[in-house]
Amino acid sequence: MKFELKTTDGRARRGQLVFERGTVQTPAFMPVGTYGTVKGMTPEEVRETGAEILLGNTFHLWLRPGQEVMRAHGDLHDFMNWQGPILTDSGGFQVFSLGHIRKITEAGVHFRHPINGEKIFLDPEKSMEIQYDLGSDIVMIFDECTPYPATYEEARKSMEMSLRWGKRSRDKFDALGNKNALFGIIQGSVYEELRDVSLNGLLEIGFDGYAVGGLAVGEPKEDMHRILEHVCPKIPADKPRYLMGVGKPEDLVEGVRRGVDMFDCVMPTRNARNGHLFTTDGVVKIRNAKYRSDTSTLDADCDCYTCKNYTRSYLYHLDKCNEILGARLNTIHNLRYYQRVMQGLRDAIEQGKLDDFVTEFYRRQGKPVPPLAENDVK
C-alpha cells in the first residue's frame, strides 16, 4: 500500500491509497461487511454507491465460517466476490463488546463463544494469522479498546498493554511474511498525554498507517474533537489516519476538518434497516405516518437507484409490510448518501473551498457549525 497526499485545505487532506487491488480516494468511508457481506447488498451494488474499500470483521469471520473455509476459497475477497481492497479490524473491539463473558490478561483474551459457549482464546499472534488468511489489504493490530469512562490510571494501563500487543502484532505480521499494510491503533481514552505516549510508542515500532481508537464509545463529542485536534497533527503527514467506528455524517465532516483520511461505521446500513434515512436536509424516519401518502422522492439531491425510482410513500409501505426490498432500498440510499458526503468533501478540499462546503452542509441540516480549536482556524 502507498499513500499519496495530493493537497490540503486547513488540516483537511485530499489523497489516495494505492493497492494492488485498486486505488481508494481519500477522505474515504468504508461500509462494514461484518460477516463477509454488506447486509442485503451484492458487491456490485455496494460498488455502485461509490465505495472503493470495505471493512470486514476478523472476530466474526473467525467464528463463522472459520479459517479453513476462508483458505479453501483463497481469501475473503474470493469468498465474498469483492475484488477491491479490504480492511479488517483485529477483533479487539468485538472482544471488548462481550463484556462479562471475557477475561483480559497480558497473554490475550479468554472468552466464551457467543453462540455455543465454547471456551476460546484470542491473542495478537492469532489475530495476525486470521487476518493473513483473510488476505486483508489493511491489517489492524490487536489492541484493547479502553472503555469509557476510564480513570487516568485505567486508561494508562490499558494503553500500555495495547502498545505491547502492538509490538507482538508487528512481530507476528512480519514473521508471516505478510506483504500487505499493518496499521497501529492509538489509545489513551480522553487523556491527551496518554495519547501522546501511545502514538510515540507506535511510531517507534513503525506502521503503514495510524488509527485513532477508543473514540465513539460514549464520550462527549467535544472530547472526540479535542483528541482529534491534538493527535492528528502529530501523525506523520505521509501516513494515512483512520478514525475507527465513526460515525454520523457530521462526525465524518468534523473528522475530515481535523485531518482524518478514513472512516468506517455500521450506522448507514443498520439505520437503513430501521427506517432511519440520511438526506441532504436531515434525517427522514420513514416509519412516520406522515410519509404514508408522500409522493416526493426521498432526497432530491441524491442520484441513487432508490431516489431515482421510488417515492417516500413506497418506502413507507415496504417498511410497514416488512418487505426485504425496503431494507435493501434504504441501504442503497444511505450508503450512497455517505459516499456523496465524502465526494463533496474531497472536491471541496481540492478546490480550497472546504469552509463553504461545511457551512452549506450544516445549513441544510439545520445545525450550527461546531467550532475548531483556535490553532485549527485558517
From Swiss-Prot:
Record note on cofactor: Binds 1 zinc ion per subunit.
Entry binding sites for Zn(2+): 302, 304, 307, 333
Catalytic residues of the enzyme: 89, 264
Record field: catalytic activity: 7-aminomethyl-7-carbaguanine + guanosine(34) in tRNA = 7-aminomethyl-7-carbaguanosine(34) in tRNA + guanine
Family to which this protein belongs: Belongs to the queuine tRNA-ribosyltransferase family.
Primary role: Catalyzes the base-exchange of a guanine (G) residue with the queuine precursor 7-aminomethyl-7-deazaguanine (PreQ1) at position 34 (anticodon wobble position) in tRNAs with GU(N) anticodons (tRNA-Asp, -Asn, -His and -Tyr). Catalysis occurs through a double-displacement mechanism. The nucleophile active site attacks the C1' of nucleotide 34 to detach the guanine base from the RNA, forming a covalent enzyme-RNA intermediate. The proton acceptor active site deprotonates the incoming PreQ1, allowing a nucleophilic attack on the C1' of the ribose to form the product.
Name of the protein in its database record: Queuine tRNA-ribosyltransferase
Organism: Aeromonas salmonicida (strain A449)
The encoding gene: tgt
